[in-house]
Design a protein with these regions (language model features):
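Periplasmic peptidoglycan-binding/anchoring modules of Gram-negative envelope and division proteins
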Residues: 4-6, 24, 29-65, 93, ...
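Canonical positions in the second alpha-helix
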Residues: 221-222, 254-255, 286-289, 313-316, ...
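Register position in tetratricopeptide repeats
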Residues: 241-242, 275-276, 306, 331-332, ...
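TPR alpha-solenoid repeat register
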Residues: 231-232, 265, 296, 352
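Periplasmic OmpA-like peptidoglycan-binding domain that tethers envelope proteins to the cell wall
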Residues: 69-173
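Short coil turns that delineate tetratricopeptide repeat
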Residues: 196, 226-227, 260, 291-294, ...
């Protein structure tokens, strides 16, 4: 049974979004200086320049969307949303030209912003907002819903004065790629200045080497800097694969002190306990391993085989094709099934060949005995 690694969550490129709204007066699409000169717009402009000039950033997408509030007619709203989008985009293009930023601009319009209306209502302090939304939700026809919104806005001032004006807008959205450290940078820092790396970067550094001693050294740094259970678990996995069961169990024990209910750590601790013939502890750990990335069915099959409960082992293994599953089938004298299992082992090794020879010997297949010895 293979131990389960607890992986890093390192992402070299992380995306962040920044938005700015330009509001319009009712049934108008002309830009106002109070809107184009807002702090929100200034911040967006600065973010675009920064994303364009910083080598650790890149503009992923720049989008301008035009909207109309949902109380007007469809034709009027479509024209308003289109004009608002176009005017906002022209303004943005002029800014980009001044700032010498070259990038494409995506466009979109929403003629009747019903979704925006619902969201604004839900976030409002209006006392009857749930009732209003339930009433409007009864109308699937947009034109009928427009009429009802008009009627309600004449009754509820909050709708007319606070909700609808927020929906008469263009929205400018910048998506920026934040570009992380290169593999070479991470390897260098992991070796000489690990304090400059966050926990995910340092865990990722361990995947950049095939030297187990280097991996363990990195995991020790993760453990000392961050106290992250994954460092101990992954150290334990290396020790387990090296056959150093005592060190593996110690490492898994430390991981369990931090994350006692983690399925992968419990699974690994169970494997190590079985390797130590500590079936009582193995049963305890494997009982908490539901949801592990590891092959829990195979582990339980091995556990029951070690206990001598071959019927339970057969049930646990199911159709798993592993050497241990074949051992259980051989013990049950189900040689045809064992032969099939061994033929389907994904990574056959010397044990696979030996077990195939055992099956051949038990079924008087001399040629197969010799070819697998």
């Amino acid at each position: 049974n293979k131990a389960a690694i607890t992986p890093d969550k390192f992402q070299r490129v992380i995306q962040e979004m920044q938005e700015a709204d330009i509001k319009f007066l009712i049934q108008q699409s002309n830009l106002r200086n109070s809107e184009t000169g807002s702090q929100e717009m200034k911040d967006l402009r600065a973010a675009i320049k920064e994303a364009d000039s910083n080598e650790k950033k890149a503009i992923n997408k720049l989008e301008v969307s035009g909207y109309a509030s949902p109380e007007g007619g469809l034709d009027l709203n479509t024209k308003l949303a289109t004009d608002r989008q176009k005017n906002a985009q022209k303004f943005l293009q002029k800014q980009l030209k001044k700032d010498k930023v070259k990038t494409d601009i995506a466009s979109e319009i929403t003629a009747e912003d019903w979704a925006g209306f619902q969201a604004a209502m839900e976030n409002s302090n209006m006392q009857d907002k749930d009732l209003v939304l339930r009433v409007l939700g009864m109308y699937s026809d947009p034109e009928e819903r427009e009429t009802q919104i008009k009627n309600l806005s004449s009754v509820y001032k909050t709708i007319a004065e606070e909700i609808l004006p927020e929906l008469r807008r263009s929205r400018l959205i910048l998506t920026t790629d934040l570009i992380g450290k290169s593999d070479d940078e991470i390897k260098e820092l992991a070796k000489n200045d690990p304090a400059q790396l966050n926990v995910e970067e340092l865990l990722y550094a361990a995947t950049l080497t095939n030297d187990n001693a280097e991996k363990i050294a990195i995991y020790q740094k993760v453990a000392s800097q961050f106290g992250d259970y994954r460092a101990y678990n992954n150290m334990g996995m290396i020790y387990f694969e090296q056959g150093n069961i005592a060190e593996a169990r110690r490492a898994y024990g430390k991981a369990l002190e931090i994350a006692p209910n983690n399925a992968d750590v419990n699974y690994n601790a169970g494997l190590a306990a079985m390797a130590d013939n500590d079936l009582k502890k193995a049963e305890e750990y494997l009982g908490k391993a539901a949801g592990t990335q590891g092959n829990l069915s195979a582990a339980m099959g091995t556990f029951y085989t070690m206990k001598g409960d071959y019927k339970a082992a057969k049930s646990a293994y199911g159709n798993v094709a592993t050497n241990n599953a074949a051992v259980q089938q051989i013990l049950n004298e189900d040689y045809a099934a064992a032969r099939q299992t061994l033929a389907n082992v994904k990574e056959p090794n010397a044990t696979t060949a030996y077990l195939t020879a055992v099956v051949a010997a038990r079924t008087n297949d001399r040629d197969a005995v010799y070819s697998n010895m």
